[in-house]
Curated annotation (Swiss-Prot):
SUPFAM superfamilies: P-loop containing nucleoside triphosphate hydrolases. It comes from the Eukaryota. Interacts with brc-2 and rad-51. InterPro entries: HRR_RAD51_Paralog, P-loop_NTPase, RecA_ATP-bd. This is RAD51-like protein 1. It comes from Caenorhabditis elegans. The lineage of its organism: Eukaryota, Metazoa, Ecdysozoa, Nematoda, Chromadorea. It is found in: Nucleus. Has a role in the homologous recombination repair (HRR) of genomic DNA during meiosis. Required for rad-51 recruitment onto ssDNA gaps generated at stalled replication fork barriers.
Length: 245
């Protein structure tokens, strides 16, 4: 054998676990058929994009429910302009039945924010939260809406928020954002402008099959790894996500 053909590639223990698909390493929803697309790695930031009412928050509830049931002692943070609907979240976890509702809710740190400064402060405070492994920011477009119209100042504010998110991911905390889609360019694009979009490497898109359908389609665009734009259909039922029959 030609020695030149022996190529050794450096691989960390984390890289090995990712390659082997270690079950507890990934964050998934409660609906296993979505795993090929919605499979999140720790220490990364993901954005879920879609029109209003398409089911972005329901996806987040499902991620949160699975996380809280599989990570028995871990905490998560929830940031949003409106209060977390714990009644909706509990619908997603009822079929597990492994923990009481009080156990679940005690491990959620909620922050209601309406201003950019409040978002910045909340992200920074999460850095000091013990055993925090997941942060969800609902409707970040509503919180950062004004940054789109302030050009350089707005970009500076967006950069500051991105940097605070990166500090969280460096601690192996997974961050999930939801953002709505705009159509003013003539095609669907994430809100908050081109600069914000350029800062998010891992992105999911949720849409309805058509205007009259209750079937949703989720697809993934993860940085350089396109994987042919995997697309999976699902529905949103009374107790969470469900497969299309």
């Amino acid at each position: 054998m030609d020695p030149s053909e022996n190529v050794f590639k450096y691989e960390t223990a984390y890289d090995l676990l990712v390659r082997l698909g270690a079950e507890r390493l990934f964050l998934r929803t409660c609906l296993s058929i979505l795993d090929p697309v919605l499979e999140l790695h720790p220490g990364k930031c993901y954005e879920i994009d879609g029109d209003l009412g398409v089911g972005k928050t329901q996806i987040c509830y499902s991620f949160a429910a699975k996380f809280l049931q599989t990570k028995k002692t871990a905490k998560m943070g929830w940031i949003g302009a409106t209060p977390l609907r714990t009644d909706h979240l509990l619908l997603h976890i009822e079929h597990f039945g492994n923990q009481t509702n009080e156990d679940i809710l005690d491990r959620i740190v909620c922050k209601r924010v309406e201003k950019i400064a409040e978002l910045q402060d909340s992200l920074t405070r999460f850095l000091d939260t013990i055993n925090l492994q997941l942060v969800i920011v609902e409707n970040i477009d509503a919180i950062l809406h004004d940054t789109v119209y302030h050009k350089e100042m707005g970009r500076s504010m967006q950069s500051d928020v991105v940097e605070r998110i990166r500090k969280l991911t460096k601690l192996e905390i997974t961050v999930i954002l939801t953002n709505h889609i705009t159509h003013w360019r003539g095609y669907p694009a994430p809100a908050l402008g081109a600069f914000w979009s350029s800062q998010i490497n891992n992105r999911f898109f949720i849409e309805k099959r058509n205007d009259d359908s209750d079937i949703r389609i989720v697809s993934a665009m993860k940085g350089e790894q396109d994987d042919g734009m995997n697309r999976i259909e699902f529905k949103i039922g009374d107790r969470g996500l469900k497969a299309v029959e």
